[in-house]
Amino acid sequence: MGRQFAGICGARGSLYGCVVCNTYLTCSKELTSKAFTGSTGPATLFKRAWNVVYGRCEHRKMTTGWHTVRDVFCVTCNQKLGWMYEMAVSESQTYKETQVIIENANFEKIAGAIKDPLGEDRQEAPPAPNLEMSRYPLEAEKKSRPQYRTVSVSSSSSAEC
């Protein structure tokens, strides 16, 4: 397997990271509910999480019934964070499918430690390109280029090669 890259994918609002290594996991815009309980105490349900690896599918009996879940681990430090719901047996619990539970003891708020790599958190407009400079070379560039001799070929005379 190639080298793993930990990054930020469309972060909006407050950022949350692994409590052990501070790797970005998700953001507040992905939050579905804080009213969950994990094996270590309170847990939070998120729509998506990044920089995680998933364990094998298992069938588990939970407080809301049987679910098919995968454990979720931090990609950097391999800390167990929680689990992802693959499938719910009960029709009333299907809203959890493909969402991730992260236990509150395993993540923390990251306060301004990570910038948005897409630059969408910038407030000012990007500078306008200087088209005049890009179309015409500078005098110094003209002198440093090799000069080629142009030969015009007319249709009436024979062309020399």
Curated annotation (Swiss-Prot):
Query: This protein's superkingdom?
Result: Eukaryota
**Per the record, where are the segments of Low complexity compositional bias?**
151-161
The UniProt entry, under PROSITE patterns, shows: YIPPEE (PS51792)
**Regions that span the bilayer:** none
Keyword annotations of the record: Metal-binding, Zinc
Molecular function, one GO term: metal ion binding
- List each copy of the Yippee domain by range: 14-111
Listed binding positions for Zn(2+) are C18, C21, C74, C77
KW Mitochondrion (keyword) present: no
Identify the Pfam families for this entry.
Yippee-Mis18
**Start and end residues of each stretch annotated as Disordered:** 117-161
Can you quote a single GO CC term? Answer: ubiquitin ligase complex
The family note in this entry says:
Belongs to the yippee family.
Indicate what this protein is called per its UniProt record: Protein yippee-like B0546.4
